[in-house]
């Protein structure tokens, strides 16, 4: 589960860019 968080943050960060 913890390894899944970075991927989610990356996707969300790309949306804000």
From Swiss-Prot:
Q: Does the keyword Electron transport apply?
A: no
Alphabetic keyword roster: Amidation, Antimicrobial, Antiviral protein, Secreted
Q: Which residues carry this modification: Lysine amide?
A: 17
* Compartment annotation: Secreted
Q: Report the domain of life of the source organism.
A: Eukaryota
For this entry, the protein name equals Peptide Ctry2801
Q: List the disulfide bonds.
A: none
Q: What else is known?
A: Inhibits hepatitis B virus replication in the HepG2.2.15 cell line by about 40%.
**What family does this chain come from, according to its entry?**
Belongs to the non-disulfide-bridged peptide (NDBP) superfamily. Short antimicrobial peptide (group 4) family.
**Species in which this protein is naturally found:** Chaerilus tryznai (Scorpion)
Q: Which GO terms are recorded in the biological process aspect for this UniProt protein?
A: regulation of defense response to virus
